[in-house]
Amino acid sequence: MELIGHGHSCIEIRLNDGTNLLFDPFINGNPLADVSLADLHPDYILITHGHSDHIGDMLAIAQANKATIIAIAEVAMYAQSQGVKAHGMNLGGRYVFPFGSVKFVPALHSSGYEIDGVMTYMGEASGIILEAEDKKIYHAGDTALFSDMRLFAKDKSIDVAFLPIGDNYTMGPEDALEAIAYLNPEITIPIHYNTFPVIQQNPAIFVEQVVGGKVLNPGETILV
């Protein structure tokens, strides 16, 4: 499979069977984004939580591609109310899709989205574990460090972990290193940094401290 970075927490995954998955599609308004909405053609859009820098352009992209949104129940219900296909899930739940399985796991964070000028609760924040093509991928979304992360690798080791390092809104580099000790992934890719002034970090310094650490700059691809 191919892992492609699009800045912030937006990750595109192209599976060998041709299925295209897109996580947290924050493109418009993202100064790091390397693509336009017209460049993206996902079959499924996976959303970790309801903040605007993660929901991003999910509706426009889903409508243009007839994609199915996979998200926490409240985010999925909002998407359905806007006329797009969505599959709602919740923490601890796992579902087998044609491309593989998706499990929603806890994240320590908040989740709300402004609708018609009102901040609306959008369910629990989550991380997402994808298992496809004999690979296990963990996208942590936005989260603080918590010790139960070690459970995510209990049954099967994690091949790739996408972990936020920006600090301020999420865990910073020090806590992300502790998370790696819990998760023990083969590859760790930092996300959620340098998009805003308060989350400035040097990813190169971070990955130097990590066995299997890799920086996935916008537009770059990693094969796993």
UniProtKB/Swiss-Prot annotation:
Name of this protein: UPF0173 metal-dependent hydrolase EF_1371
PANTHER family noted in UniProt: UPF0173 METAL-DEPENDENT HYDROLASE MJ1163, UPF0173 METAL-DEPENDENT HYDROLASE MJ1163-RELATED
Family annotation (Pfam families): Lactamase_B_2
Gene3D superfamilies referenced in this protein's UniProt entry, alphabetically: Ribonuclease Z/Hydroxyacylglutathione hydrolase-like
Lineage: Bacteria, Bacillati, Bacillota, Bacilli, Lactobacillales
Organism the protein comes from: Enterococcus faecalis (strain ATCC 700802 / V583)
GO molecular function annotations of the record: hydrolase activity
Keywords, alphabetical: Hydrolase
UniProt family annotation: Belongs to the UPF0173 family.
Protein's UniProt keywords contain Transcription: no
Keyword Repressor found: no
